[in-house]
């Protein structure tokens, strides 16, 4: 490929020959191009080297300076602006493809604005070269200039520095000092002497069109400059505002400019993409496309009645039920008082909740759950849900104000462990947090409690005021109500420690006392343990047990919600331990289910994703009368099974199938099957599940890579063993088969099975023959494999 210099060496002689040709009467650039069309062929292969504008400029230059030598012309047109343009090109080419595409889009948008609107340069200092033939120095001397005030308006001054410069021998000067021009930054401001207005250049700016107003003797001369000008401010006359000249993607002035530029577009719809893809312009899209508002003319004769032909089934009525989101049902189970209360809450949050600006939203339906908002539950500050046992709580508010409480409370916990033979030290931070929460709650409602428990106050109750020296054991013994404060704060600390313990510790301690204990009266048991501890630490004497019992009854009435949860947890644990202690015979797994679970009468085939439009289901859907003719068809006769059918069925069932069993979203291992129950290992813990419970609620989830498994085990709560468990098991499988049939073969008969046999293979082969009466079973399974898996997982693995 030829370079730019070689192309110019070919062009210059042709232009000179054309201009000197006397046979041509009317000489012009267009006529020259007509006679030298081959120049465009050359230009086609050298697009980046020389353009049509370059040829035109070269023609005008030669026409005005016919005697200039060829080498000088080639030198000037080969290198003027070359260095700067090369730097710009290299800088742009180094950008990543994605950034370059974004940059091109951004440039085109700004180029549209600057090319259509007249953005006037607002530069405080502008240098202008003024012709001075008496000046023999061809260098640009910034020191020798005269200053003139170009204009002053809108509190803005523009100072023009007129620099004398001899332009008579400009071309010869440029050709001789080409190297100096290429490496001198002061010529860069004047585009290497291509213009006489000097404004700084920046590669960070775009090559867009600007207007420079040059004022001479009250005459304003607008000069158009298109270059990478480093202009800080531009002025737009239509808005009478000055704008900072930055080329951000999200320019806040786009909206103002857009309202000005829309009337100037000849075909506004061509710019729809610009307006829709920009945040600042998208609001102007309707104004851009100029959609006229629909107007309605009033009728001359207004209609008094509108007659509507109603369908008959409209009279029957209809009902629309709101299907609750899955999280509304799950949160009820998660908030039930149980041994795994906090674990259930945290699992619920991990599965259904995402936080945005401290607000809790369901990731299925998008509804805000206010009780789980960070500001509502104070999860971050108090860890009401995410309980941490081994992390200091005094790094956050409000606990950092009570960091001095650690010494008193931690000493009490160590004393409790030593005296009562417990292990509460590992939960010291949680105990400290619960104590502070309780005291903060009492402090906020102290005046209300003083009126409510006036009788109890006379007997020793003292509602503490939260202060800086509350836990200071060195506080003056002369302080009012000193003994009452000491007794109440020691009791609260001991009470919270006991509530953080487990039922095994409480029952072990009460058993060692060798006294008859009524475990249904938990308040009395707590009073006994707290009294024994306070008596051994010499906080109370042996005659104050009734006082401690009064304290227990009173403080449990005003306990925080979390302490009440611990209280109920201990009651459940004690009931469970007592039940286990009584039941030393062979366990009956059929009656050991203590959780009541509602059983649905019918399973609906819902889609795998939930959207707001699908949360409404209309029932009692009736087909409009006279819409189509219903043809009554006779039932299809079910084929009788042959030896060949049995072989095909056995080949299908012989496929190696590995089944994954999951319990509560956790993989189960080492499954052992017995006549009445199943033994599984989940996270290194062995669990026992009675077989009859599988028909009550869906505990076990089955996963397989073989679609045949999902077809013939569809709706089967226990898809193992050669024999079914009971007649109820048979009914479950028949119901599941009909669900599958209704979804994938809606025009088929209802599947029935009248045998009393519990043989699994007979029932599954009967369903195979039922399917074979309508379709080729193998091909049908392959075609509907995705739908079958989806139906199985939605209905039985959710």
UniProtKB/Swiss-Prot annotation:
Disulfide bonds: none annotated. The keyword Manganese does not apply. It comes from the Viruses. Its main location: virion. GO terms for cellular component: virion component. It is found in: Virion. GO terms for biological process: DNA-templated transcription termination. Residues 1-195 are annotated as: Interaction with NPH-I. Residues 234-254 are annotated as: Interaction with J3. Induction: Expressed in the late phase of the viral replicative cycle. InterPro entries: Pox_Rap94. One of its GO terms (molecular function) is DNA-binding transcription factor activity. Keywords: Late protein, Transcription, Transcription regulation, Transcription termination, Virion. Signal peptide: none annotated. Interacts with ETF via its N-terminus and with DNA-directed RNA polymerase via its C-terminus. DNA-directed RNA polymerase-associated factor required for the transcription of viral early genes as well as for transcription termination. Within minutes after virus entry, recruits the core RNA polymerase, the early transcription factor (ETF) and other enzymes needed for transcription initiation, elongation, and termination thereby allowing synthesis of early mRNAs which are extruded through pores in the core particle. Recruits the multifunctional J3 protein, with poly(A) polymerase-stimulatory, cap nucleoside-2'-O-methyltransferase, and transcription elongation activities. Belongs to the poxviridae protein RAP94 family. Part of the early transcription complex composed of ETF, RAP94, and the DNA-directed RNA polymerase. Interacts (via N-terminus) with NPH-I. Interacts with J3. Interacts with ETF heterodimer. This is RNA polymerase-associated transcription-specificity factor RAP94. It comes from Fowlpox virus (strain NVSL).
């Amino acid at each position: 490929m030829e370079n730019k210099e070689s192309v110019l060496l070919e062009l210059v002689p042709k232009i000179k020959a054309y201009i000197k040709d006397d046979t041509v009467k009317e000489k012009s650039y267009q006529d020259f191009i007509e006679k030298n069309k081959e120049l465009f062929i050359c230009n086609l292969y050298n697009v980046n080297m020389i353009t049509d504008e370059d040829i035109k400029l070269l023609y005008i230059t030669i026409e005005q300076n016919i005697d200039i030598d060829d080498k000088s012309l080639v030198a000037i047109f080969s290198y003027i602006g070359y260095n700067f343009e090369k730097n710009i090109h290299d800088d742009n080419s180094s950008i990543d493809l994605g950034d370059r595409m974004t940059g091109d889009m951004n440039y085109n948008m700004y180029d549209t604005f600057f090319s259509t609107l007249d953005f006037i340069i607002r530069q405080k200092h502008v240098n202008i070269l003024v012709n001075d033939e008496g000046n023999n120095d061809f260098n640009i001397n910034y020191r020798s200039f005269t200053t003139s005030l170009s204009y002053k308006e809108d509190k803005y001054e523009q100072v023009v520095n007129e620099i004398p410069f001899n332009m008579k021998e400009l071309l010869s000067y440029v050709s001789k000092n080409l190297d100096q021009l290429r490496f001198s930054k002061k010529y860069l401001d004047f585009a290497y002497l291509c213009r006489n207005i000097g404004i700084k250049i920046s590669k960070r700016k775009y090559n867009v069109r600007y207007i420079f107003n040059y004022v001479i003797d009250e005459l304003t001369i607008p000069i158009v400059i298109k270059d990478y000008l480093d202009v800080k401010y531009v002025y737009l006359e239509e808005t009478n505002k000055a704008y900072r000249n930055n080329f951000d993607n999200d320019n806040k002035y786009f909206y103002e400019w857009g309202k000005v530029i829309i009337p100037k577009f000849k075909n506004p719809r061509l710019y729809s993409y610009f307006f829709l893809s920009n945040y600042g312009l998208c609001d102007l899209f309707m104004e851009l496309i100029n959609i006229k508002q629909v107007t309605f003319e009033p009728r001359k004769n207004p209609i008094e009645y509108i007659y509507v032909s109603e369908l008959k089934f409209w009279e029957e009525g209809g009902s629309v039920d709101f299907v609750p989101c899955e999280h509304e049902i799950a949160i009820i189970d998660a908030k039930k008082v149980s041994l795994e209360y906090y674990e259930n809450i945290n699992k619920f949050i991990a599965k259904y909740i995402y936080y945005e600006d401290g607000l809790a939203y369901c990731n299925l339906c998008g509804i805000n759950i206010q009780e789980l908002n960070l500001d509502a539950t104070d999860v971050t500050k108090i860890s009401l849900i995410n309980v941490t046992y081994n992390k200091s709580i005094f790094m956050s508010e409000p606990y950092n104000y009570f960091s001095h409480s650690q010494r008193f409370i931690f000493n009490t916990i160590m004393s409790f462990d030593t005296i009562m033979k417990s292990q509460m030290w590992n939960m010291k931070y949680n105990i400290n947090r619960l104590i502070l929460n309780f005291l903060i709650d009492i402090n906020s409602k102290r005046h209300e409690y003083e009126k409510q428990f006036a009788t109890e106050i006379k007997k020793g109750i003292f509602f503490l005021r939260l202060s800086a020296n509350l836990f200071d054991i060195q506080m003056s013994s002369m302080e009012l109500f000193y003994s009452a404060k000491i007794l109440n704060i020691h009791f609260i600390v001991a009470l919270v420690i006991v509530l953080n313990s487990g039922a095994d510790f409480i029952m072990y301690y009460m058993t060692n006392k060798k006294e008859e204990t009524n475990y249904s009266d938990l308040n009395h048991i707590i009073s006994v343990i707290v009294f024994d501890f306070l008596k051994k630490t010499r906080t109370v004497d042996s005659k104050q047990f009734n006082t401690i019992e009064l304290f227990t009854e009173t403080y449990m009435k005003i306990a925080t919600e979390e302490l009440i949860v611990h209280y109920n947890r201990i009651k459940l644990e004690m009931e469970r331990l007592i039940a286990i202690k009584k039941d030393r015979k062979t366990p009956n797994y059929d009656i050991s289910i203590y959780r009541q679970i509602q059983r649905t009468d019918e399973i609906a085939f819902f889609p795998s994703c939930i959207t707001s439009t699908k949360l409404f289901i209309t029932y009692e859907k009736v087909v409009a009368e006279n819409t189509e003719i219903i043809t009554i068809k006779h039932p299809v006769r079910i084929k009788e099974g042959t030896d060949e059918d049995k072989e095909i069925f056995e080949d299908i069932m012989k496929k190696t199938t590995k089944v994954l069993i999951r319990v509560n979203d956790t993989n189960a291992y080492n499954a052992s099957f017995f006549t009445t129950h199943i033994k599984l290992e989940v996270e290194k813990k062995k669990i026992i599940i009675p077989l009859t419970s599988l028909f009550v609620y869906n505990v076990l989830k089955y996963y397989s890579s073989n679609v045949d498994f999902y077809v013939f085990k569809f709706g089967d709560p226990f898809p193992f063993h050669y024999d079914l468990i009971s007649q109820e098991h048979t009914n479950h499988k028949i119901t599941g088969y009909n669900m599958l049939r209704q979804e994938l073969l809606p025009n088929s008969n209802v599947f029935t099975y009248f045998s009393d046999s519990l043989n699994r293979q007979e029932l599954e082969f009967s369903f195979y023959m039922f399917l074979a009466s309508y379709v080729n079973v193998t091909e049908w399974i392959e075609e509907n494999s995705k739908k079958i898996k989806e139906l199985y997982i939605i209905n039985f693995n959710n």
